[in-house]
Design a protein with these regions (language model features):
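Aromatic- and Gly/Pro-rich donor/ligand-binding loops
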Residues: 1-107
Length: 107
């Protein structure tokens, strides 16, 4: 299966770019960058994707499409959207794709 990497295509936060570079260095092979804010609408071939970093501007864009096979490491839920993000659909998705590696105790 091909690999995807989460990218943040419309941000000026250098930390988002650094996290993307770290994953690219880790996987060290061919990959496609997928926009963090539109993972739900990905409709290309299935890909394994490391899900890491800060989630997200629009909680309605989660969970990712069924063509994304996630591995959650260093995952963080933005506290400002947690009440909208952690709906029954998202919680079911996270349970289905356990374990979820989180980067902080809040998440």
């Amino acid at each position: 299966m091909k690999t995807g990497v989460i990218g943040c295509l419309n941000t000026n936060n250098i930390g988002d770019y650094i996290q993307t570079l770290a994953v690219i260095k880790l996987i060290g092979k061919e990959y496609k960058i997928l926009d963090r804010e539109s993972l739900n609408s990905y409709n290309d071939e299935p890909r394994k994707v490391i899900i890491n970093g800060w989630f997200m501007e629009n909680p309605l864009n989660f969970p990712p499409s069924n063509n994304i096979k996630p591995l959650f490491i260093s995952f963080h839920i933005n506290p400002d959207i947690a009440s909208d993000f952690l709906n029954s659909n998202t919680v079911s998705y996270l349970k289905e794709h356990q374990p979820i590696g989180c980067r902080d105790t809040f998440t």
